[in-house]
Amino acid sequence: MNPMKNFDEFLREGIVKKQHIDMSRARFLVKESEKAYQFITSINKGMGINDDNANSIVKLSYDTIMELIRAEMLMHGYNAAGQGAHEAEVSYLKNIGFSENDIQFADQLRYFRNGMMYYGKILDKEYAEKVIEFLNRVYPRIKNMSK
């Protein structure tokens, strides 16, 4: 994995564009993330995490986090699109006060999710549990910013 670029670099490159604040779309993304978070929580409490559902849990957790980051960006008039958009969204975590460790974990999550989607990478229960721990820690924090 390459080192994470600064959010301003993504702006300069045109991957992130400044736009009008889009509260309607941001609220929609927050609501969708709430539903997904509740679903992940119910799976975790019900059937639990295992090697068979690890990829699904990781993908859904990633999407939940990214929906909140996108909502926060939209509330501040930013939108990322095209090649590098997901990296730009992860780099935005620094702008909203997340630690370098959290940003690195989110970037690793992005990288592994990409590996699953495009290269057939299989993740295990242990990694999925780490992702759930990360989700449970960052989800409330980002969600509170999006109010």
Predicted regions and their residues:
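Terminal alpha-helical segments
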Residues: 1-147
